[in-house]
């Protein structure tokens, strides 16, 4: 992988999506700044340890999920996505995240989704 400071926000997000689908927590965490801020309706998590905790929860909620990202809107170093994920027993159909990128890493992310049982 190229040096993080030379990656565009689009390249960072592409890598982020690949490692998320693979369930690679270390790969996910590597895309975040040391001082990252991760905001959810449940609270604010900080740093790489906070990011790790957040994604352990997300991947625990949606293990081995099929992911869809129908909307990606970039503006400079900011991204908004809408997403869906379906696992064997649970799904999220209303996921929405925002990202702020800095120096080839994710500096801030907000996440919101509703977990429901699969019909």
Task: Enumerate the predicted regions with their spans.
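Flexible loop/hinge segments that line or gate small-molecule binding clefts
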Residues: 43
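A general alpha-helical scaffold signature found inside nucleotide-binding enzyme cores
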Residues: 11, 50-53
């Amino acid at each position: 992988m190229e040096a993080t400071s030379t990656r565009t926000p689009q390249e960072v997000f592409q890598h982020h999506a690949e490692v998320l689908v693979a369930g690679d927590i270390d790969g996910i965490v590597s895309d975040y700044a040391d001082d990252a801020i991760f905001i959810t309706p449940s609270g604010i998590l900080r740093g790489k340890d906070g990011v790790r905790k957040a994604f352990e929860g997300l991947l625990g909620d949606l293990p081995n999920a099929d992911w869809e990202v129908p909307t990606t809107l970039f503006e400079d170093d900011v991204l908004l996505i809408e997403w869906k994920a379906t696992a064997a027993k649970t799904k999220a159909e209303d996921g929405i995240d925002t990202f702020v990128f800095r120096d080839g890493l994710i500096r801030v992310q907000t996440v919101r989704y509703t977990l429901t049982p699969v019909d």
